[in-house]
Structures are given as C-alpha cells and as structure tokens.
UniProtKB/Swiss-Prot annotation:
Pfam families assigned to the protein according to its UniProt record, in alphabetical order: SHIPPO-rpt
Name the UniProt record assigns to this protein: Protein STPG4
A GO CC term attached to the entry: male germ cell nucleus
Example GO biological process: pyrimidine-containing compound catabolic process
Organism per entry: Homo sapiens
Entry function: Maternal factor that plays a role in epigenetic chromatin reprogramming during early development of the zygote. Involved in the regulation of gametic DNA demethylation by inducing the conversion of the modified genomic base 5-methylcytosine (5mC) into 5-hydroxymethylcytosine (5hmC).
Name of the encoding gene: STPG4
Main location: cytoplasm
C-alpha cells in the first residue's frame, strides 16, 4: 500500500536585534517518498520468464541424431550405428559363421582384362590424301598413284611395320680383320716420375769414413784428471753437463 507523500512548508521567524523589527521568511517545500518506493526499483525490471529447469536443453548427441545426412565413418558408406553381422547374446567361438573369404586370385579372374599389346592397323596410304569421296569409278578408269612410303619385306613378326627404319649406309662393313683375328698392341706406359724431374740420387748409401759405434777403442783422456775430480764427475755427472766446463 502506497503511502501519500506529505508536503510541508517550513517557516522561520527571524528577529532583527539591531532594528528591533521581526519578519517571516518562507523556504522551499520538501517532498517525502516512502521506503517502499525507494527500495522497489528492482521490481520494475522483473519479467515473466521461466525459471531454470522448466525447459529441456538438447545435448550434442541429440542434435547430431536430428541431422538428416547419414554420418559416414568408414569406406562402405555406413553410419556409426552399424548393425553387427551376427546377432548373438553370448559371443562364443561356436557362434561365428563358417565361411572362407575369396582369394585375391579369384577376384582377379572375375575382372575383365582391357589391355592388349596389339594395336590398330595403320590406315591405308590412299586415305591419307585429300580426295573426293563422291567419285565412283570402276577399276581401270583411273591410275593408281604410288604409295607415299616405299614398302619393304617385314623381318619381324612382332612389329607389323614395313617402313625402313635404319638406313644401311651407316652399317657398311670396312676392310680389315674381324673381331678376334688380330692382337691389340697396347702403348707402352711411362713410369711415374717426379714433378721436378730431378735426377739426383736420393736414397743411396753414404760413403763416410767415420767409424761406427764399437769400431774403435776409447783413448785415455789427456790431460789426466785428478782422482778427486774424477770421483766428483762420476757422482754428480759433471762430465755430462752441456757446458763441459770441466773439460775446458
């Protein structure tokens, strides 16, 4: 129930203390609204729509079944719901049908071969030239023209062609012995030489007069060393120093 709005006009009395006179001033009227109107704005947006769960939404499986086009998922243009070959409740080995699939040779024998190595005969040379087909002449009333291609005896039974293919001018026999009646002379091969063509002997025994190890006896060192120096050289290897300061 709506409550009526109450409009009140407030007045204020103001006294002028200085002059001792009083006067009345009127303010603007204020309109008050009820709490029902302030909080009921959302009721206007409500519409008469069904609540969730009052209608059924179709799933993607139900929508796929409504498609009039049959789904083809194999090579035989059959749908996914392919009926089984054998309807059985308990699939055991004895329920399988006994059959023998046809061999591929049997399938090939049923196919008709449409190929052959024999070709159509060549058209007659007389039909290759332009002539009047309306002429009806009896034999002896015309002169037969020579064939455009000379004919030769056919030597092959496979290719029924009498056209000369390879001229004999390229296969004229030459004078001389045949294959196997002569010896082939090979040219002499030269040995491998150096690129510098040097004739200096490389790996020859060197003629040196220096005797080898063991071919001579060592001489006693001169001047003779004192026993103290000789002992120091044996103990400290002083005689094998690179400087050889003891031998100088």
């Amino acid at each position: 129930m709506d409550q009526p709005a109450v409009a009140t006009a407030s007045t204020s009395i103001r006294e002028d203390l200085v002059g001792g006179e009083s006067f009345i001033t009127a303010s603007k009227p204020a309109q008050k609204t009820s709490s029902f109107e302030r909080e009921g704005w959302w009721r206007i947006a409500l519409t008469d729509t069904p609540i969730p769960g009052t209608y059924h939404l179709k799933t993607f499986i139900e929508e796929s079944l409504l498609n009039p086009v049959i789904a083809t998922y194999n090579f035989k243009n059959e749908g996914r719901k392919k009926p089984p070959l054998v309807q059985r409740n308990n699939p055991v080995l004895n329920d399988l049908p006994q059959y023998m699939p046809p061999d591929f040779l049997d399938l090939l024998k049923k196919q008709v071969a449409t190929y052959s190595f024999k070709d159509k005969p060549r058209p007659s040379p007389s039909t290759l030239v332009d002539k009047d087909q309306s002429l009806q002449l009896s034999p002896g009333q015309y002169n037969v023209l020579p064939a455009p291609v000379p004919k030769y005896a056919s030597r092959s039974c496979v290719f029924r062609s009498t056209v000369q293919r390879f001229p004999t001018t390229y296969f004229i026999p030459h004078e001389g012995p045949g294959p196997g009646h002569y010896n082939v002379k090979m040219p002499p091969t030269s040995s491998v030489t150096s690129c510098f063509q040097s004739r200096v002997p490389r790996f020859l025994p060197s003629c040196s007069k220096t005797p080898g190890p063991g071919a001579y006896t060592t001489l006693r060192q001169f001047p003779k060393q004192s026993p103290t120096i000789a002992k120091m050289g044996q103990e400290h290897s002083l005689f094998f120093n690179n400087n050889n300061w003891l031998l100088k």
